[in-house]
Every structure is written in C-alpha cells, then in structure tokens.
C-alpha cells in the first residue's frame, strides 16, 4: 500500500469516527494511530509520512467543510447528504478536498484512489456511487481552483 493510500485510509477512519462520536478529528486521528502502536506516539506501525498526509487531509476537510459539502450537495442528484452512507460521504469529502485544494495531485489519481478506498471500506455499490458524483464534480473543477 502506498503512503498516500495509507494516509487517505487513516483520514477516512478519523472523519468517520468524528461523525460517530462528535470528537475533534485530529484527536480521533491520533487515537487511531495510537491504537496501532499500543498507546505510544505513532511508530513504524503507522508510516510518519502517511500520518502527516492524513493529518493534512483531515485538517483540510474540516477547515473547508462548508465549501466541500456544497459541491457534493450540488452534484448528488436525487441524494440528500443526510441519506448518504457516512463512509461514502467522507470518502467524497476527502476526494473533493484533493480536487479543490491539492492541484499537485492529478484528478484521475484522486478519483481512482477514492474509488479504491470505497471498494475497501464501503458497501457493494459505494465505488460506483463515489465515482458518479466525483466525475460530476471533477468536470467542473478548473486548474485555477
């Protein structure tokens, strides 16, 4: 697994857990990584670069949540965000953050990573659901955003 994939998966787990327990996402991310290393600071069990990328993603999503959710709501025809599975919604949030605020990551890489994470963590139809909405959003994102 690549460092960035590991970071995306950690970020997803932190955002999902934040939704469930209404706790600060950074605290949740730290707690998740500590559970891998039995209460210590993140060690070899969690790659430090993956942790840093996950932290960047979590902070980016939390800081820009209103704009990100607005884009998702705008393009998710016939789906209110309240009806979306929390896993799918948080995968979308992470990917939309990358599309809007990380122009150094190619759109096709962001989309492919989101689809792969959806296959691993989501329901049977999550990958196609995520792909459909991200395709709509990606087509409206300019390189200047």
UniProtKB/Swiss-Prot annotation:
Belongs to the NusB family. Coiled coil: none annotated. It comes from Geobacter sp. (strain M21). One of its GO terms (molecular function) is RNA binding. GO terms for biological process: DNA-templated transcription termination; transcription antitermination. One of its GO terms (cellular component) is cytosol. NCBIfam families: nusB. The keyword Transcription applies. It comes from the Bacteria. SUPFAM superfamilies: NusB-like. PANTHER family: ANTITERMINATION NUSB DOMAIN-CONTAINING PROTEIN, N UTILIZATION SUBSTANCE PROTEIN B-RELATED. Involved in transcription antitermination. Required for transcription of ribosomal RNA (rRNA) genes. Binds specifically to the boxA antiterminator sequence of the ribosomal RNA (rrn) operons. Keywords: RNA-binding, Transcription, Transcription antitermination, Transcription regulation. This is Transcription antitermination protein NusB.
